[in-house]
Amino acid sequence: MLVMRPAQAADLPQVQRLAADSPVGVTSLPDDAERLRDKILASEASFAAEVSYNGEESYFFVLEDSASGELVGCSAIVASAGFSEPFYSFRNETFVHASRSLSIHNKIHVLSLCHDLTGNSLLTSFYVQRDLVQSVYAELNSRGRLLFMASHPERFADAVVVEIVGYSDEQGESPFWNAVGRNFFDLNYIEAEKLSGLKSRTFLAELMPHYPIYVPLLPDAAQESMGQVHPRAQITFDILMREGFETDNYIDIFDGGPTLHARTSGIRSIAQSRVVPVKIGEAPKSGRPYLVTNGQLQDFRAVVLDLDWAPGKPVALSVEAAEALGVGEGASVRLVAV
């Protein structure tokens, strides 16, 4: 059974293996043992902290095969994007250039560097083993975070954002970076992403142009790549769009990938999930798949189960499922249909 749980210090070697296979652009999952160790330690401190409002906390989860102990995925939530440093994005805007004497009235698409999204909660670090990308476990790895948020709303902001990795070709060339960022740094896209993952995106962002960029002046390839999704990030994009996220007015400052945005209370898994009592018995012989969590904090667990459940009734769990979730008879779980 695959179980989602908080990452632990002992997970570091396997987490680094996952990071090494993650696509370029996932700067929140650097292939660097020291940074990953810091990430896990910060997460452990966040799970242990008493929190009444969102602050500097970050929560890092792993997806584990309970039989073998192998990690096959990971994901994270940052409680407040840009808590310790500005969270930069490019904002899509329209400038109007007009001349009454020439009867000209042109609307021009521009990009403005901003940190409007600072303070929102941020979904990051999504990775799932390639053979699981099209499976229900990709849903568990992504949406399990949302059920954690549903159980602990005081720890998160009223809005959630996620930066989706933008388009780059098989050689790692990003048309958007080549047209914009590379003019300000003597770095190719892969080098820039690695550097930002090992250090900070902020110091690079602060060297980006602070005046609006006129989109029509960019090469066609760069314009066409704006808002486009990297093939390996498509599953993340699709899952979150089904959750009610929208492509807002922002794109990533490095690769031009879309930034998704949603009101926390309107996210499907949060709005439609239910807390129900547990009855332990035989596993149902038929049913539909549900994401199920124990709603706990440091001992948080989430799994996918086929359940025959009706609203207003207890949910029947097998002994194996109850043990995986760490719940007993009469306890409660939070669930939502896949």
Swiss-Prot record:
Catalytic activity: succinyl-CoA + L-arginine = N(2)-succinyl-L-arginine + CoA + H(+)
Domain of life: Bacteria
Protein's pathway: Amino-acid degradation; L-arginine degradation via AST pathway; L-glutamate and succinate from L-arginine: step 1/5
EC number per UniProt: 2.3.1.109
Keyword Transferase: yes
GO molecular function, one term: arginine N-succinyltransferase activity
Protein name per its UniProtKB record: Arginine N-succinyltransferase subunit alpha
